Curated annotation (Swiss-Prot):
Protein name in the entry: Large ribosomal subunit protein bL9
Organism from which the protein derives: Burkholderia ambifaria (strain MC40-6)
Pfam family for this entry, one: Ribosomal_L9_N
InterPro entries reported in the protein's UniProt record: Ribosomal_bL9, Ribosomal_bL9/RNase_H1_N, Ribosomal_bL9_bac/chp, Ribosomal_bL9_C, Ribosomal_bL9_C_sf, Ribosomal_bL9_N, Ribosomal_bL9_N_sf
Leader sequence residues: none
Amino acid sequence: MQIILLEKVANLGNLGDIVKVKDGYARNFLIPNRKARRATKEAIAEFEVRRAELEKVAAEKLAASQAVGEKLNGQSFEITQKSGVDGRLFGSVTNGDIAELLKKAGYEVEKLQVRMPEGPLKMIGEHTVQVALHTDVVVDVTINVIGDHA
């Protein structure tokens, strides 16, 4: 399906690009999340009229994300979990737990924005986690997992 992107989408393209994607990806993700529209002649003409407005909104989102990213980059947060004497956690610290921790600290972060390439944290100690505030703004945050011996 041919679509026109209404914002920058990772691994796909930038605002205004006309790309071909699988029908399911367009119908189930891009179009419902208002990231794209079908690339009909009418939609392309309407997009060209609204292009400046959409670019302004995208620039504002990027600037806001960069401002939050400057505050958040390099920050360290502590989370306490029950653990055994060998340093392994009972359970794990997931991206949802980290997003909740960041929300309590005053940052608007969804769990999908927290990237944990090595999977959930299962050991006590310091771990570096990435937070993707925008497709162009990715910051590193240190999570210090403290063991609460049961």
